[in-house]
Amino acid sequence: MFGELGVPEVLFILGIALLIFGPKKLGDLGKGLGEGVRGFKSALRDEPKKEETKA
């Protein structure tokens, strides 16, 4: 379903989002999303590996 989105469709969706949220709010949303993804990747990378205990 989503695999068939082309460049025109993505641009249309971004244009609608720009109209709804405005340029400043859209930039803030993108910044927050980027920081969240960066934090998630950092947490995955820094997670200590748990040792399996033999019973």
Swiss-Prot record:
GO biological process terms, alphabetically, are: protein transport by the Tat complex
Keyword Hydrolase assigned to the entry: answer is no
GO cellular component term, pick one: TAT protein transport complex
Q: Which regions span the lipid bilayer?
A: 1-21
Keyword Acetylation carried by entry: no
Q: Pfam families attached here? A: TatA_B_E
| Classification via InterPro entries | TatA/B/E, TatA/E
Q: What does this protein do?
A: Part of the twin-arginine translocation (Tat) system that transports large folded proteins containing a characteristic twin-arginine motif in their signal peptide across membranes. TatA could form the protein-conducting channel of the Tat system.
Q: Which NCBIfam families does the record cross-reference, listed alphabetically?
A: tatAE (TIGR01411)
Q: How does it assemble?
A: Forms a complex with TatC.
The entry's protein name is Sec-independent protein translocase protein TatA
To which species is this protein native?
Koribacter versatilis (strain Ellin345)
The gene behind this protein is tatA
